[in-house]
Each structure stands twice: as C-alpha cells, then as structure tokens.
Swiss-Prot record:
HAMAP family: Ribosomal_uL24_B. Disulfide bonds: none annotated. NCBIfam families: rplX_bact (TIGR01079). Belongs to the universal ribosomal protein uL24 family. One of its GO terms (cellular component) is ribosome. Part of the 50S ribosomal subunit. Keywords: Ribonucleoprotein, Ribosomal protein, RNA-binding, rRNA-binding. It comes from Cupriavidus necator (strain ATCC 17699 / DSM 428 / KCTC 22496 / NCIMB 10442 / H16 / Stanier 337). PROSITE patterns: RIBOSOMAL_L24. One of its GO terms (biological process) is translation. SMART domains: KOW. One of its GO terms (molecular function) is structural constituent of ribosome. This is Large ribosomal subunit protein uL24.
Length: 102
C-alpha cells in the first residue's frame, strides 16, 4: 500500500521548491509528479502529423517520494501510518491521527 497516492495534497520538504504545495498527478514507483512543482523547460519538436507546434514547453518533473509529505487539516506536513480498521488497511496521519480518505 502506497502512503502517497494520486490526488493527495502534499507539501515539498526539500529542494528548490521547498514549502510549495500541490496535488499529486501521478505516482511513478518511488517518485511522484506534483502539479505546479519542479517544472522544467523542455524543447519540443513540431509534429505536423499531430498538429503540434514546436517550442519551449513547461513540463512537470517527478520528485522522490521521500521529499514530499501529506498536508494535515492544520496545513502542516505529516507522516503517514497504516492501521487496520474493520479488516481493511487505512492510511492515518501521524500528526492528527485522522484517517486519510482513500
């Protein structure tokens, strides 16, 4: 069970984007792509078959999953634990003890 999933609200803990918040767009193994965070400029070639124009494109680059943390109700970063409730494993915030919506 992944502790961070697509759609979670996270905050960046380290790096050039430290303190920024965003929503997880994708989980790629041990990396996560966070909307509006860690944006790089990539040069794209024009493709007349697809009708795309070339130029410089902003692209979201993935961050290591250990460099982000879930945001609790108080807006603070929180680690995530796993508990068993009613025979199912649920994610629980360590700071508040609240269950994270699946």
């Amino acid at each position: 069970m992944n502790k961070i999933r697509k759609g979670d609200e996270v905050i960046v803990l380290t790096g050039k984007d430290k303190g920024k918040r965003g929503t997880v767009q994708a989980v790629l193994g041990d990396k996560v792509a966070v909307q509006g965070v860690n944006i790089a400029k990539k040069h794209a070639r024009p493709n007349p078959m697809l009708g795309t124009t070339g130029g410089v494109v902003d692209k979201v680059m993935p961050l290591h999953i250990s460099n982000v943390a879930l945001v609790d109700a108080n807006g603070k970063p929180s680690r995530v634990g796993i508990k068993v409730e009613d025979g199912k494993r649920v994610r629980v915030l360590k700071t508040t003890g609240a269950v994270v919506a699946a």
